[in-house]
Amino acid sequence: MGFEGRYVKRLDTDLQRKALRRLRYIEAAQTLEDLRVPPSNKLEKKTGDLKDFYAIWVNAQWRIIFKWKDGDAFDVQFIDYH
């Protein structure tokens, strides 16, 4: 994976910090089960149009979704869930 960790002006700084923490969890994970900790990640397999994705919570509104294969996350996206 790999990300730059730069802040953007359009999003709240606290939200960005939480998202960056979650991205670090994803980057460090060796298995999907690793992402069940902490429980606040609320790891879930998506359905419907997003059936190929997994998601973890950033907060009630925002999710990080990603695909997982052979111990690596890819197609990582930060989405407004509502």
Whereabouts are the PLM-identified features?
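Polar low-complexity intrinsically disordered regions enriched in Ser/Thr and small residues
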Residues: G5-V8, K51, F74
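Arg/Lys-rich, positively charged N-terminal/basic patches that mediate binding to nucleic acids
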Residues: M1-L23
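A residue-level signal for conserved active-site and pocket-lining positions in enzyme catalytic cores
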Residues: I26
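A short, surface-exposed loop/turn module that caps and links secondary-structure elements
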Residues: Q30-Y54
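Enriched for short, Lys/Arg-rich terminal
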Residues: E44-T47, Y54-H82
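Short, intrinsically disordered low-complexity segments
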Residues: L20-R21, L35, W62
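Generic structural signal for bulky hydrophobic/aromatic residues embedded
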Residues: M1-F3, A29, K69
